[in-house]
């Protein structure tokens, strides 16, 4: 059968919080089968726990932010979430000693390295997938996000549309089937991006204090300000796809479906996930006893790092 996955051992890393600009330590710990993905604020006494869920996301203005009923928050979970989703992790305790996950270099690549360095092991319990049964679509103006039935894995098709000389039509769309290999080699290094005018405004109101050219792509009216340029020619749309993978994994399960989006962001991604889960006819839990019947990316030999 396709089994659940966790880490072989605990691991930690220290970085900077995107909004606070302060040091943050992230610790990832193995968890027993059927625990799920659980975030924890360990700087509070007692520690506050956040099981992964679509409903826990209550702020999507600048990132994907979990907030509980007492107003306790953990921000910027999407890049770590995307890394966990791509590696098929099911059970993990994510501890952080601040209100946000460290931004690292603005991509998911440092989290991939951290997870693989700790090692991934299978557990003696069947892995649950969410399989899409009916098409669900959400819209906001000209923006939209949609999930259609597709049982072979998670298919992704993302389009951005920015009026900027550095964002030409040939770098606005990207398509990919989610697997560890595709994620690591094709999109994991894609960094978050922003515009200089937005950075100046955010920092004036005390946000994005940890943002810099070391952890984001910054564009002015005409060019990219980062001296090293882009890591991929289509890095911007690839990062938006990376974000969507992390946002959809807030349900705590790998999804089998066909996701497509136009100008979507954290808010619309979460709105789609909530709409899917609210419609009991739109999805179902499935497990796979026969590894040969498993979705793409989860078959024996396709995840060679286990």
Swiss-Prot record:
Keyword Metal-binding applies:
yes
May I have one GO cellular component term?
Answer: membrane
InterPro entries membership: Ribosomal_Su5_D2-typ_SF (IPR020568), UDP-acyl_GlcNac_deAcase (IPR004463), UDP-acyl_GlcNac_deAcase_C (IPR011334), UDP-acyl_N-AcGlcN_deAcase_N (IPR015870)
Which cofactors are reported in the record for this sequence?
Zn(2+)
Recorded E.C. number(s)? 3.5.1.108
Origin, by domain of life? Bacteria
Which catalytic residues are annotated?
266
Gene Ontology molecular-function annotations: metal ion binding; UDP-3-O-acyl-N-acetylglucosamine deacetylase activity
Reaction equations catalysed: a UDP-3-O-[(3R)-3-hydroxyacyl]-N-acetyl-alpha-D-glucosamine + H2O = a UDP-3-O-[(3R)-3-hydroxyacyl]-alpha-D-glucosamine + acetate
Cite the annotated pathway: Glycolipid biosynthesis; lipid IV(A) biosynthesis; lipid IV(A) from (3R)-3-hydroxytetradecanoyl-[acyl-carrier-protein] and UDP-N-acetyl-alpha-D-glucosamine: step 2/6
What does the entry list as the binding residues for Zn(2+)?
79, 239, 243
| A family per Pfam | LpxC
Q: Which family does it belong to?
A: Belongs to the LpxC family.
Q: What protein does this entry describe? A: UDP-3-O-acyl-N-acetylglucosamine deacetylase
């Amino acid at each position: 059968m396709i089994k659940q996955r966790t880490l072989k051992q605990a691991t930690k890393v220290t970085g900077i919080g995107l909004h606070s600009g302060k040091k943050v330590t992230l610790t990832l710990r193995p968890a027993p089968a059927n625990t799920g993905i659980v975030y924890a604020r360990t700087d509070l006494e007692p520690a506050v726990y956040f099981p992964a869920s679509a409903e826990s996301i209550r702020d999507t203005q600048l990132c994907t932010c979990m907030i509980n009923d007492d107003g306790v928050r953990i921000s910027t979970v999407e890049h770590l979430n995307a890394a966990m989703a791509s590696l098929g992790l099911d059970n993990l305790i994510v501890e952080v000693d601040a209100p946000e996950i460290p931004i690292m270099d603005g991509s998911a690549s440092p989290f991939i390295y951290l997870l693989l360095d700790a090692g991934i092991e299978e557990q003696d319990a069947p892995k649950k997938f969410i399989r899409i049964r009916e098409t669900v679509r959400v819209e906001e103006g000209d923006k939209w996000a949609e999930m259609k039935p597709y049982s072979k894995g998670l298919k992704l098709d993302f389009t951005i549309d920015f009026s900027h000389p550095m964002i030409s039509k040939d770098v606005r769309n990207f398509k990919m089937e989610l697997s560890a290999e595709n994620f690591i080699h094709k999109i994991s290094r894609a960094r978050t991006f922003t515009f200089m005018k937005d950075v100046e405004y955010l920092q004036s109101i005390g946000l994005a204090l940890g943002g810099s050219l070391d952890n984001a792509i910054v564009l002015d009216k005409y060019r990219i300000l980062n001296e090293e340029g882009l890591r991929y020619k289509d890095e911007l749309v690839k990062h938006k796809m990376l974000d969507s993978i992390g946002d959809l994994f807030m349900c705590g399960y790998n999804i089998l479906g066909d996701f497509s989006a136009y100008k979507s962001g954290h808010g619309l991604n979460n709105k789609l996930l909530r709409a899917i889960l609210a419609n009991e006819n739109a999805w179902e839990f499935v497990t796979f006893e026969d590894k040969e019947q498993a979705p793409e990316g989860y078959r024996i030999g396709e995840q060679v790092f286990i």
